[in-house]
Amino acid sequence: MQYGICNLSIVPLRKEATDTSELVSQVLYGDIFKILEQRKNWSKIRLAFDSYEGWIDNKQYLETTEEQYKYLHKETPKLCIDLVEFIQDTNQQLHPIVLGSTLNALSILNHSHDGNIVEGKAPKENIIQSAFLYLNAPYLWGGKTPFGIDCSGFTQMVYKLNGYKLLRDASQQATQGEALSFIEESEPGDLAFFDNNEGVITHVGIIMKDNYIIHAHGKVRIDRLDHSGIYNVDKKMHTHKLRVIKKVI
């Protein structure tokens, strides 16, 4: 088995081994992974954080050792808490990194960083505060950053910043935590899931107080939440049908 680490800010993770393939997720600076298959230009990887799989360009990561991988995997993540920061290499060149990037491998990559970091589990009350960091970020299928993010990437990154692990897709996240029977039982920071006409869970958002929800739909935005689903305050209509509320923390 071979191992890798992302040494660039935001790297696309694709469904197939081609630049034109669907963006299924993104690999952020400091993310580590197992290399499942290597081709001339592409590698199929499995991310350590959420076991998500996809194809990454061979020019956009560095191979690492099994020992380094295991060391980094068991370490408590040290995360960038600023929207944009910079790390510096041995040539004094700056490299941008974004909110939620992992900084545990700085010494392995011969990089330095003197910005703000966060590590460990935070109180549940911090979830909404972290969610506001992504407010108005444009929607991007497969995205995980303030410059483009999808609904489950948003919830995953917000929870990650507070020391909690969610899976990558909304349907996967819906398998986590404890189901609540009523909205009234929920607390700010709980997750609400929404399904389509076929009953497939396709959307997720973070519940706020007073029956509001923050979620990625066009952009990261705040709408009303009721027993039917999400009521879009701009369109004056329901846009998502509520399926289940889950308490993960």
Predicted region positions:
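Aromatic- and glycine-rich peptidoglycan recognition patches
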Residues: 3, 10, 62-64, 180, ...
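Short, basic/aromatic beta-hairpin or loop at an interaction surface
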Residues: 3-14, 71-85, 157-173, 208
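A generic structural signal for residues embedded in beta-strands
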Residues: 6, 35, 105, 193-194, ...
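Short alpha-helix capping/helix-loop boundary micro-motifs
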Residues: 17-22, 84-93, 174-182
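Short aromatic-glycine-enriched beta-strand elements
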Residues: 40-44
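Active-site nucleophilic cysteine motif
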Residues: 131, 145-162
